[in-house]
Amino acid sequence: MIKEYKTLWSIPNNIGYFISSNEQGHSHDQYKYANFSFKVGDRENSVQSNINDLKNLCSINNIAFMNQMHTNKTRELIYYKNNTNTDGIFTRNKKIACAVLTADCIPLLVTDKLGSFIGCIHAGWRGLKSNIIENFFDNIRFSKLSDLRVLIG
């Protein structure tokens, strides 16, 4: 279901990331096997089972999924909150993982060389046109631009 690709991205040891596949999971038919979206018509219990499996594999209880709207909105998560209406989230809270779902959009994962935060961006053409990436970087000014590490999926 998930694969760890540490070699693709030079990041601090306190940061982990995973890229999921559709090879295993509880979803069926057109939703493949490991669907994590409640918005596409898959059975809710299948999606929740897939999310629970992901939490177990990653050993984390709080995975924050965005309610991706194809906008330029970004938000910092100080406390765990799921389904925030945004297309970019970041957190400095070590007990929260950030998740981005894509089909034909581009996922970006962001941290800095110290691993002081983790974030992700859902970049579709509407978000790119309305400066989602610029808005995200405007919200993480606590980290120097030269210290940032970005993985484009």
Model regions and ranges:
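Conserved nucleotide-ligand handling architecture
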Residues: M1-I19, E23-Q24, D29, N85
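Intrinsically disordered, low-complexity, positively charged segments
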Residues: Y17-D53
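Phosphate-centric recognition/catalysis
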Residues: E44-I121
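Hydrophobic/aromatic beta-strand patches that form the interior of the parallel beta-sheet core
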Residues: F18-S20, A64, G119, L151
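A generic structural signal for short beta-strands and their flanking turns/coil linkers
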Residues: K32, N62, D104, S146-L148
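Short, glycine/acidic-enriched capping/hinge loops at junctions between secondary-structure elements
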Residues: D29-A34, E76-I78, N131
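A residue-level signal for beta-strand positions that form part of recognition/binding surfaces
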Residues: N14-Y17, Y33, I63, A97
